[in-house]
Amino acid sequence: LDSYGTVLATPFNMAHTQPEMNALVSRLKEFDEPVTILLEYTGHYHYPVLKKLQDEGFPVCVVNPYQMKKYGDVEIHKAKTDKKDALRIATYALEKSYKLVPYSFMEQKYEDLKFLSRQYDQRIAFVAKLKVQLINLLDQTMPGITKFLALKSRNPEKSALMLFIKRYKSFDEIQRMGKTRFLSTYATLMKKTTDRHAPQKGLAIYELARDSITTRGEDPYIWSAQDQCVDLLAAAQNAADEIITQMQNIAETIPEYKVLRAMNGVGDRLGPVILAEIGDIRRFHSAKALNSFAGNDAPPYQSGQFESRNRHISKRGSSALRKACFEVMQALKLTKPQDDPVYQFILKKEQEGKPYNVAKMAGVNKFLRIYYARAMELYR
């Protein structure tokens, strides 16, 4: 569209290849007016177009898909096609040109951190899924075993339950071994684990195995499935640990990471994740903007004489950042650092009668405000 809203070119398809992108660039350079380009966030699929056009010197802006959805809600007769979406985005760019800001990539280390954070989330999600699958299998071969040996995937080579599954397969196998032989082999096996309490549970586990009824305890196919789950779980956890180590190495080169790690509740895992989700702190003009980015803001609602005093957070922001910060609040509640302002703020909100999780999210708000103030001091 030109500045008068006239359609200069009807929507057309274009592959993300050099020949077709070069043809688009040539066409854009033919226009007499300055060109403003607006793209919609589409995962990582818009990055080739964004990179190519920026390299050619065009100002490229990027809009959130939710904004475009709400912008299209004003239409009475709604229609959803790629061609109509293209015209809708162009109209939005023309109408909102006064507030569009060209997209700029963060420093490479921030981009790398964010990429690794997404990979870490995927590995951890896979770990959680494998744990559910493994417990489902254990309900058929070793019902109740997790009451004595918890399923912990950290340091899988020394996990008591994972070693136990690999060695004994099912309760039927334990019954065949007999009490004396089982207790002897169990004591030897538990020397490989870091669980301090596991060695004392041998007799209780044997009694559980003796009294339990298994449904597929002698099935070699379920034994194979269990072993595969254990191996996959160990591999996924090791992959997640490797990624978090890479994130720690990058984070240590960023000045504000020391500020973040010095805050109570932030450890070697949550620190890099929070830093990855926030990115460069200098891109936020205020602590309020940082909370809004996290979706932890509560927009005002007022109409006439009515003014709401019981508002909910918007959740229009990074859910990964909210989750990581919420885990920091959980750590504060466990460790109870009496001199920590965030912990004291959570206690204050709880004493005011706020629900448990509402008080924690209020703590997240204060946590991000404190972090913003301390981190920005490094760049002043």
Pin down the residues of each PLM region.
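A detector of single, family-specific signature residues
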Residues: 1-380
